[in-house]
Structures are given as structure tokens and as C-alpha cells.
Amino acid sequence: FSQNQKTEIRDKFGINKNDICLTFVGRLSFHAKAHYFPMYKALQEVSKELDKKRTIHLIQVGWFANDFIEKQYKEDAKLICPDIKCHFVDGLDQNQKNLILSASDIFISLTDNYQETFGLTPIEAMAAGIPALVTDWNGYKDTVRDNIDGFTVPTIALKSGSSIDLLYQYYSNIINYDQYIGYVSQRVAVDIDVTIRKLKEMILNDSLRKEMGKHGKERAKSNFSWSVVLDQYNDLRLSLDDIR
């Protein structure tokens, strides 16, 4: 995307040159994707230390499963992070999503849900040339390199086997899958203090963001572009042929 296109999209959301724009991409679901509280709380705390002439914007690109979830997101945003300009955008518009990513300063995704596997959105952000702040969760650990392409934030969970009761209820059809992942996610916590420190470091250091964004873009191209991935699949096919 051209610089003019990036400027236009920032102008559309009222994001000034000195403002900071963070973008989250994914399903907007607090029980089945990522709970918004750590993100909202950390941004609000960081905003207290910013120059009053600078505003933090959070663009959440995704979709809501129902009206109740949408209502909770928007009401809680006003309560938890009143000094953050929150924008909600349709994540099904791929061109708009990619343009917003390219015009953003930081990608943020503090997922805390067991259904999250590889996670494609951090790679999309890296390909757009912006640094990422993500949790050290599942596939995210294999995409974003801590202190290189961005920062990873620790997560804490109850010890192994602590959710057997919920698993029993799920397999017994006492609760459905949606309820199961919601209940299990309550047994995971994101380290908000570390999130605040890392956010502050990224927001206050323009050169760090640019350097991390550069590394991330190089990594996305060299490790995750289709040509590279297809070659890896072909190598796997050949190795399996040898085994057979």
C-alpha cells in the first residue's frame, strides 16, 4: 500500500501523525478467542504516562458472534480504557484489514484460549512490517521472536489435569464446546504487568518499532511465504516416500 493510502486510513479514524495506533485482528470473542481485559487494562495504564497531545487508538478488526458479545465489548471498553480511542471494524473485508495493518504502529494479540493453534494474524502483521505484541501461546511462540520481531508476554495456567472436571462435563454433553472453551479459558491469565512494560517500551521508542517491524517483515517473507511453505511440504512428501 502507498503512503497516501496509509495516511488516508489513519485520517479516516482520526489518528494524528503523533498518535499511536494498535490493531487486533481476529474473532471478537472474549470466551473463545482472547479476553479483552488485559489489553484494555494495559493500554489504559500506559496512556497515563503519554504526552497529553498523543492519543492511543485501538482498532479491533473482526466480527461478533452475537449482539450480546458486541454490547459487552463496547460497554467494557468505555469502563476499562476510557482514555483509549476504540474502533471496531469488519474483519471480513480483507483489503481493509490489510490496509489497516500496514497503517498501524503495533499489532497486539493477547490470546488466552486453548482453541488457538498456529495463529495466522501475527504473520500477517509481520508481513505488513509492523512489530507484534503477543502472548507466548501455542503457535505464537513459533512466529514472533521475543525482542526481535516484537515482544511475547507470559501466560499462566493451572497445572496439568486441573480441567478434567470440565472435560468430563463436555464429553458427557452436560456442557457444549462453546461453554467448555469459555470455562477453561478462565483458568488462564495473561501477565498484565509485563504487558504494560512492553507496551510502554514499544510506544515510546519509534526506532525500536521500526527495527522490529523490519525484522518481522523479513521473517514473514523468508519463513512463511507460500513459496517457502510449499517447498517444505514437498520436502515432507519426499521424506515420507523414502520411509514408505
Give, region by region, the residue ranges found by the protein language model.
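Conserved catalytic-core segment of nucleotide-activated headgroup transferases in glycan assembly
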Residues: 1-91
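Short alpha-helical donor nucleotide-sugar binding micro-motif in glycosyltransferases
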Residues: 91-94, 99-104
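Acidic donor-binding loop of glycosyltransferase active sites
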Residues: 102-115, 130
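Short glycine/serine-rich donor-binding loops of glycosyltransferases
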Residues: 119-122, 140
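Short hydrophobic beta-strand element within catalytic cores of glycosyltransferases
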Residues: 131-134, 144, 151-152
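A short acidic/histidine/glycine-rich donor-binding loop in glycosyltransferase catalytic cores
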Residues: 148-161, 166-188
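A short, well-ordered alpha-helix in the C-terminal region of glycosyltransferases
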Residues: 194, 201, 208-222
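C-terminal alpha-helical cap of glycosyltransferases
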Residues: 198-204, 226-244
